[in-house]
Amino acid sequence: MNFTAKSVPYQETGYFSKLVSDYLNEKDFLRHFYEHPVSYEGIEAAIRERELFPTDRHLLVKVLKEQYAGISLEDAVMKNLEALDRNNSFTITTAHQPAIFTGNLYFIYKILHVIRISQTLNARYTDRFFVPVFYMGSEDADLDELGYIYLDNEKLLWETQQTGAVGRMQTNGLEKIVDRIEGEFAGDPHGPELIQMLKSCYVGSENIQQATLKLLHHLFGRYGLVVLIPDNRLLKTVMRGIFKDDLTIHAPYEITERNNRLLEELYPVQANPREINLFYLKDNIRERIDRKDGKYQVNNTAIHFSPEDMEKELANFPERFSPNVILRGLYQETILPNIAFIGGGGEMAYWLEYKPLFKHYRVPYPVLILRNSFLLIRKGWKSKIEKAGLSTPDVFKPEEELMENFVRSNTTRQLNLDKQMTEMSGFYQSIKNISGAVDKTLEQHVEKLETQALQKLEELEKKILRAEKKNHEEVRRKIHEIREALFPLENLQERVDNFIPWYAEYGKAFLDQILQHSLALDQMFIILEENQ
């Protein structure tokens, strides 16, 4: 398989926020909220800062090797694990919760983006080494967001009554979805390989985070991707000081709140800090910690601590404290020798809140890079787009705009009344002159009559256009069909579809193609047209 790539500015797709557009355009107002530009100069500055920070590399590598125990490691992963123990190595990181079967396509895209950036930097800076890392948000408890996939717009839901951190959940019940996938894709060229991979990873694993680790290693291990599960006692010992600050003096709350007040002058704030930005994580519980009447209360439970007992709990069991979105990035950047973070638009918004928090704790702030986005167009749809008289970038436009453009370009009839409106304005001007000569106060009355008349003509013009559109209903049907196929559930394809149909058809060649067309530091939306 192979694709032809075209690129479109993110701003022209209509699917990205003003904040994202302004960040990509390096608007002056936002410059205060991040540290480094998305450029090689920004990368080099991030490296210099990171070299001064005492990352515990030995601890990191020890934990990673323990997490990979029992998995037959790809040579590229082993090489990268060994490299992380050296001071001249740095990570390029993306993060996501362990959505079942990788969830949406963008999960795959963001991983391939960190791999592409690492490859690019390794070629450019031969005296340093760059490792792609997937930081698994396995402590997230939002099963509603993580427990399903879409196949052909059908929602396949994991039916389970488990609660708490999704990464810790057992995989019971997922075999039903695997069976459903097998029934549909077993006959595809790479269907048997796909089914065996899913069964091995999910049916044969103790929990979701282990299943996700195995799946990502199977898919991306040959590229050297290192997967980190931060739900770990040893790693969290490094954070005890910051966690204590959060529990007692609420420094993260106060710092982030001040920054957000500045940010919200122009943009909606993505996440508001709480006085305590930690969850209590134990067994099947992940609940918010609140402070009430001088005691700490674990929300929705009978668990509570005195200040003294909470201090002991943190000292003895740091693994029971789970950072929320405000502290998650700080935890990530404390334990990894990281220089760049790749995330989606929502993640960019989170990270723009963090900079003062990083400054306060003297943790290096990474280069923020918007993850790559793709629209995949199969060869059959490419042909239909051309027959409808559209170019591939046109498909981002709303249906009505596409229809109007087609009608205006393909009709022999006059559809606008611009000439008539100009003539009418002249007509009313002459009446205004006549009446004004008699009584100046009549001019205002004539102006109102003109406004009303022009509005009536504008309404008529719209009716003429609507009537002409009805003469091209077949074109409308084709445009709707194209938009429905490329933008499932009226959303970007990457936010709905899963990688499974593509992998069943093309296997790892699909991943190779996405990687080949992935941009490194350039920031454009990529359209991939499947070639005949």
Task: Identify the residue ranges that each predicted region occupies.
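Long, compositionally biased intrinsically disordered regions
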Residues: 1-3, 215, 219-305, 312, ...
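A structural-propensity feature for long, helix-poor, extended segments
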Residues: 143-150, 376-408
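A translation/RNA-centric and nucleic-acid-associated enzymatic feature enriched
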Residues: 269, 274-339, 345-356, 365-367, ...
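Short acidic, glycine/serine/threonine-rich loops at helix termini
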Residues: 105-106, 143-149, 238-243
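Low-complexity, highly charged intrinsically disordered N-terminal segments
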Residues: 14-75, 276, 457, 461, ...
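N-terminal catalytic cores of NTP/NDP-binding nucleotidyl/phosphoryl-transfer enzymes
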Residues: 89-122, 343
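Glycine-rich phosphate/pyrophosphate-binding loops
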Residues: 104-105, 118-142, 366
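A glycine-rich helix N-cap at a beta->alpha junction
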Residues: 150-177
